Amino acid sequence: MNIVQETKRRLAAALTDAAATARAAGEISYDELPDFVIETPRDKTHGDFAANLALLLARQARQSPRNVAAAIVRHLERPQPGVARVEVAGPGFINFTLDNQWLLPVLPAVLAEDDHYGWSNIGQGAKVQVEFVSANPTGLLHMGNARGAALGDSIANLLTAVGYDVTREFYINDAGNQIENFGLSLEARYLQALGQEASIPEDGYHGEDLVATVGRFIAKYGDKYLDTDPALRREMLVRFALEEKLDAIRRALEDFGVTYDVWFSEQSLHDSGAVARAIADLEKAGYIYEKDGALWFKATSFGDVKDEVVVRKNGIPTYFAADIAYHRNKFERGFERVINIWGADHHGHVARLKGALQALGYDPRRLEVVLMQLVRLYQGGEILRMSKRTGQYVTLEELIEEVGRDAARYFFVMLKSDSHLEFDLDLARSQSADNPVYYVQYAHARICSILRLAKDRGLEVPPAREARLELLQDPAELELIKQIAAWPDTVAGAAQALEPHRLTRFAHDLASLFHSFYTSCRVLADDPEVRKARLVLVEATRITLRNVLHLLGVTAPERM
């Protein structure tokens, strides 16, 4: 149940009728009623809901917004069920203050819907693909990858909760120049390990981790590939190393609570001819031309600032060409929406990719790109640039060891993705109210403690229909119920905007309101009817808080 949306619809219908009555009475004039919104005001003194109808209607009516609002309010059917007060405020908002009766259906709905409270069917089963992380398989996962993992998985959870059929996908960059350099670097380490003279390319991979990888390769194959064809040797080394690296990436992501439905190989696009077909089809459509021995895509025809090479002068397709084929493949697999989580450094890639898809006949709006900014780790008040253990960048595995999965996932989605994130390791480890995830989890654990205490006294949470919920009249109780009632709307809004940071804000507010309620109201009150009602409220809070944390991929502990 979404009591907030139901109430908004009812108020919107009442305003529409009142505006029509005011027009019939000659008090206002308009040709067509504009699309207006009813929102929850941030300032509680402005009531429970505020409508902007009069502000939008003023120009047609040729009156001030306040005069239009006053005319509409005069013709509202009275009494409106559940409405305690209607007033014109500010420049012409129509504010509604409701009586507490409108909140009564919320708590029974929460207990009935349980782990699906907040879910909806907005997506109606439409197929959506979320591609995220897609890290370079030649290395380990860094903080940018970690933020992308938390962000992408939370977005996928949100879309599932609002009724989409979601596929999580990891794109394996196992083709192109980087893999060629990776193979040459592995080959050099292999030959060196077997006593041969060899040097790593200047732009190759110089990390010591390749020494260990080659050592395991030799343990399995010995010098079998020492005197073989160099191309075969590199192929075998790359195949072995990529399998190891991808296994490590997969394990790290699983430890982070992220699992994928599809691992898609870039090389498969070349092997199947999909890249060549995409280029040929763009050429047939008139969007490919030759210059300086290379083939170029006319990205400027679609609003980009410059055209882009798709085939180099040496005849090798670019990464962009493979990306065109990959995204075409996504739509060929039947996805109605395709969502990519990319680093902000890829912002220039968005317009040209959308242009290529449009050139191939696809609606570019079906591709949505969420860009995320950099992450900076702080420890002891200073930027932590390198791992103290390895001397290289801090990996996801090390972060999980340092602060735990829950804190890492929560911190990574606390801010909007296009904001730089300063990740304070000391704060993430602290067990205090200053730590946002600890604060929220502690609220859940405290609720569970209350329910255990009640059980020890022979008390259970009663069925909501058996509780006199109208007894919940304390301001702290009512504010808590209002926050619980706002959860379905919060999920829908966060899913629509692809903004999971809204959930962390909601979780913090819900935890704060619960702590205030706990301070103001004795849950296990002497009055048995009040006690029953408060137990229902506490259980509804627990369910809602757990549901928020689960969408974020964070556990809801029963003890802390």
Swiss-Prot record:
CC terms in the record's Gene Ontology section: cytoplasm
SUPFAM superfamilies, sorted: Anticodon-binding domain of a subclass of class I aminoacyl-tRNA synthetases, Arginyl-tRNA synthetase (ArgRS), N-terminal 'additional' domain, Nucleotidylyl transferase
Catalytic activity: tRNA(Arg) + L-arginine + ATP = L-arginyl-tRNA(Arg) + AMP + diphosphate
Keywords of this entry: Aminoacyl-tRNA synthetase, ATP-binding, Cytoplasm, Ligase, Nucleotide-binding, Protein biosynthesis
Keyword Ligase: yes
GO biological process: arginyl-tRNA aminoacylation
Assembly, per entry: Monomer.
Family: Belongs to the class-I aminoacyl-tRNA synthetase family.
Name this polypeptide is given: Arginine--tRNA ligase
Organism: Moorella thermoacetica (strain ATCC 39073 / JCM 9320)
Gene: argS
